[in-house]
């Protein structure tokens, strides 16, 4: 459609110029469009009728603005600003052959400006290399940004999954909490159930009493060592029954303390009497003195090794013959005046300490059975004490007779 050759014939004119010339030169439409008085321009007198009647007939559209843009493309200009008058130096009445000099202008777009500038100002080699490096750098930055964007999208998806999971767990916890609250409310509604919800203080809520482990009778049952009795007092209770129980516990504790003092005093007096009697016996005998035992060892060892019948002691039993061979024969004691000379002679000659002390010395060699050693010693001391008591009873009865 464009004509760039100046030597073309009139038959090769653009259709827009040919149709425009015919439309303006038609005398039947002079009331709408016509030539000016100078015959070098044309005037559109009635644009609405021009758009409604003439444009559809010649150009197959009714847009007056589009017609004006096409005139500007072919070099037409507005001759009078107060009316629609357009002119071109080669568009003259009666001279259609001049229109061959009218050429359509190429539209200038924004993206074509760099190409024009490049044609006008060619780049040097250094500038071209610099531009290429910049293009490569920008391309790499674009790729890095795209990768980072992809990672951000993946992290966002992971976060969304975690948030969804946390919401589900929260809903589950709320459901469990509601279930527990409903269960507790149902339990509290039951008759005969009372719960003390007052805060408890650990220091005053429970008190431990450690009872002594001293036992003075070998026939009592064995108890665990260091056994403690815990007396729990409820701070929040204010009923009379709780005060009564506390009072009874205090009375029991005071009575236990009294009995403990009484037993300890009796134990000390018995040990003192036994030590005095042992000294009298040891002065007249040639056997080595056995180490004294405390009251605690006596009670504990007597329970660890209790004989089948601790209350029955055979004072007339004869010592083992094999052990008597190893012992040194003691000289006979001097005769004692009185009716019970035979008794004293038998008592001092049949002292069981010689055999029992040897057993104790043999058992001390075993380091793995220390409890057994204490049991044998305590058993001998308990037998010795019981024997002395019974012999004293025989002595008093014989003297009376």
Curated annotation (Swiss-Prot):
A motif (AHA1) lies at residues 256-265. Keywords: Activator, Cytoplasm, DNA-binding, Nucleus, Phosphoprotein, Repeat, Stress response, Transcription, Transcription regulation. Residues 122-188 are annotated as: Hydrophobic repeat HR-A/B. Residues 351-373 are annotated as: Disordered. One of its GO terms (biological process) is response to reactive oxygen species. A motif (Nuclear localization signal) lies at residues 207-213. Exhibits temperature-dependent phosphorylation. The keyword Coiled coil does not apply. The hydrophobic-rich region (HR-A/B) corresponds to the oligomerization domain. AHA motifs are transcriptional activator elements. Homotrimer. Transcriptional activator that specifically binds DNA sequence 5'-AGAAnnTTCT-3' known as heat shock promoter elements (HSE). This is Heat stress transcription factor A-4a. It comes from Arabidopsis thaliana (Mouse-ear cress).
């Amino acid at each position: 459609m464009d004509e760039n050759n100046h030597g073309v014939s009139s038959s090769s004119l653009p259709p827009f110029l040919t149709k425009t010339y015919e439309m303006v030169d038609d005398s039947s439409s002079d009331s709408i469009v016509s030539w000016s008085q100078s015959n070098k321009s044309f005037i559109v007198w009635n644009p609405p009728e021009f758009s409604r009647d003439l444009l559809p007939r010649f150009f197959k559209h009714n847009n007056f603005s589009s017609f004006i843009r096409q005139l500007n493309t072919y070099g037409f200009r507005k001759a009078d600003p107060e009316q629609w008058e357009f002119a071109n130096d080669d568009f003259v009445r009666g001279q259609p052959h001049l229109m061959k000099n009218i050429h359509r202008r190429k539209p200038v777009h924004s993206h074509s400006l760099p190409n024009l500038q490049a044609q006008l100002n060619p780049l040097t080699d250094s500038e071209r290399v610099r531009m290429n490096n910049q293009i490569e750098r920008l391309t790499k930055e674009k790729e890095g940004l795209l990768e980072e964007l992809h990672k951000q999208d993946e992290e966002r998806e992971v976060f969304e999954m975690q948030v969804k999971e946390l919401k589900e767990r929260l809903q589950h916890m709320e459901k469990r909490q509601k279930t527990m609250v409903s269960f507790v409310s149902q339990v509290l509604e039951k008759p005969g159930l009372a719960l003390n919800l007052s805060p408890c203080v650990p220091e005053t809520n429970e008190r431990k009493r450690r009872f002594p482990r001293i036992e003075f009778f070998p026939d009592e049952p064995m108890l665990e060592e260091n056994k403690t009795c815990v007396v729990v007092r409820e701070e929040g209770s204010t009923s009379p029954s709780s005060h009564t129980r506390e009072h009874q516990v205090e009375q029991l504790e005071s009575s236990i303390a009294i009995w403990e003092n009484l037993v300890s005093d009796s134990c000390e007096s018995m040990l003192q009497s036994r030590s005095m009697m042992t000294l009298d016996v040891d002065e007249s005998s040639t056997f080595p003195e056995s180490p004294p035992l405390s009251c605690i060892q006596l009670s504990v060892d007597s329970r660890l090794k209790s004989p089948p019948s601790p209350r029955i002691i055979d004072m007339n039993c004869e010592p083992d013959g094999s052990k008597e061979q190893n012992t040194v024969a003691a000289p006979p004691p001097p005769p004692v005046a009185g009716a019970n000379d035979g008794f004293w002679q038998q008592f001092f000659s049949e002292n069981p300490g010689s055999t029992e002390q040897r057993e104790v010395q043999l058992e001390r060699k075993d380091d793995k059975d220390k409890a057994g050693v204490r049991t044998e010693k305590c058993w001998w001391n308990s037998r010795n004490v019981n024997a002395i008591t019974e012999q004293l009873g025989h002595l008093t009865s014989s003297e009376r007779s």
